[in-house]
Amino acid sequence: GSLLLVLFLLSVICYAEIAAGPTKCQYGRPCDSDRDCCWEYRCLSSGEEYTCKQDPGP
């Protein structure tokens, strides 16, 4: 029974991490894609690395 409890707790923690993903992203955080950033930011290159930045627009 205790193994199931551990698995349950792990799945809850993992789900919480995924659910909290967009809220903990901040401006200038390193990213691999736009999904790593909040909706108002985009994953843009500043020369060396990609970071979450405001979309400069068209």
Curated annotation (Swiss-Prot):
Expressed by the venom gland. It is found in: Secreted. May inhibit voltage-gated potassium channels Kv1.1/KCNA1, hKv1.2/KCNA2, and Kv1.3/KCNA3. May also increase intracellular calcium release through the activation of nuclear inositol 1,4,5-trisphosphate receptors (ITPR) of cardiomyocytes, thereby causing an increase in the contraction frequency of these cells. Residues 1-16 form the signal peptide. Keywords: Calcium channel impairing toxin, Disulfide bond, Ion channel impairing toxin, Knottin, Neurotoxin, Ryanodine-sensitive calcium-release channel impairing toxin, Secreted, Signal, Toxin. The presence of a 'disulfide through disulfide knot' structurally defines this protein as a knottin. This is Putative calcium channel toxin 196. Transmembrane segments: none annotated. One of its GO terms (cellular component) is extracellular region. Disulfide bonds join C25-C38, C31-C43, C37-C52. Belongs to the scorpion calcin-like family. KTX subfamily. GO terms for molecular function: calcium channel regulator activity; toxin activity. Residues 17-26 form a propeptide. The lineage of its organism: Eukaryota, Metazoa, Ecdysozoa, Arthropoda, Chelicerata. It comes from the Eukaryota.
